[in-house]
């Protein structure tokens, strides 16, 4: 069964864009978007298989600006943080990772973004991030940063390793590769960051 709905367009001549809300992963198992529990028929049994993978984070070394602190204080579960360029999404995302206390996978779509995240991890926590990509496959750090393509190729090795996933530039999540990484992962928390 699939549930879809049309997104209204501004131009009545444009075809409607469709959003797929429910997909069959395999017999007896469906995938729903986060926050759409209203789509689950009453006769379905919900089995939550999300994983907690607690780790000890070093102390976060910096103070958040008030707008960042407001977001940080609000987040207790899955969230999307949509803020302007230079607001400090990376910085705030790392603070939230520390707050949630779960082994964290940061998903990036470029090597420069992955490297930027690794520098920020070192700066704010004083630790080296694990890297997945460029011939490296390091899973032992509290925070691991990986490129989408490499994560996709290693999807079976990472699906039960993390308690939190942070999606940088999450507006790319509509790509099949990005979606597959999310849909097959057992992490407890999913945090999306976007500037668009």
Which role fits each region the language model picked out?
Residues 122-157:
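Inter-Walker segment of RecA-like/P-loop motor cores
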Residues 2-6, 111-136:
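Conserved helix-turn-beta segment of the N-terminal RecA-like "Helicase ATP-binding" lobe
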Residues 85, 110, 194:
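The conserved Walker
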Residues 24, 46-82:
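Conserved pre-motif I regulatory segment
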Residues 2-51:
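Interdomain "pre-motor" coupling segment immediately N-terminal to P-loop NTPase/helicase cores
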Residues 148-196:
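SF2 helicase catalytic motif II
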Residues 77-100, 105:
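Walker A/P-loop
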Residues 81, 106, 144-146, 165:
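Hydrophobic positions in the central parallel beta-sheet of the AAA+
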């Amino acid at each position: 069964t699939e549930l879809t709905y049309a997104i209204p367009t501004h131009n009545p001549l444009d075809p409607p864009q469709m959003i797929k809300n429910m997909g069959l992963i395999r017999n007896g198992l469906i995938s729903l978007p986060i926050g759409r529990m209203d789509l689950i028929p009453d006769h379905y049994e919900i089995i939550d298989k999300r994983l907690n993978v607690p780790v000890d984070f070093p102390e976060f070394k910096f103070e958040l600006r008030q707008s960042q602190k407001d977001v940080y204080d609000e987040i207790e579960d899955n969230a999307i943080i949509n803020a302007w360029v230079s607001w400090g999404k990376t910085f705030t995302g790392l603070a939230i990772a520390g707050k949630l206390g779960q082994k964290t996978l940061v998903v990036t779509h470029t090597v420069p973004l992955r490297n930027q995240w690794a520098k920020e991890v070192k700066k704010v926590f004083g630790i080296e991030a694990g890297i997945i990509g460029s011939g490296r496959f390091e899973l032992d750090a509290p925070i691991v940063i990986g490129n989408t393509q490499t994560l996709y190729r290693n999807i079976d090795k990472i699906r039960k390793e993390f308690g939190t996933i942070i999606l940088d530039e999450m507006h790319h999540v509509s790509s099949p590769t990005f979606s597959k990484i999310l849909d097959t992962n057992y992490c407890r928390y999913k945090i999306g960051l976007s500037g668009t």
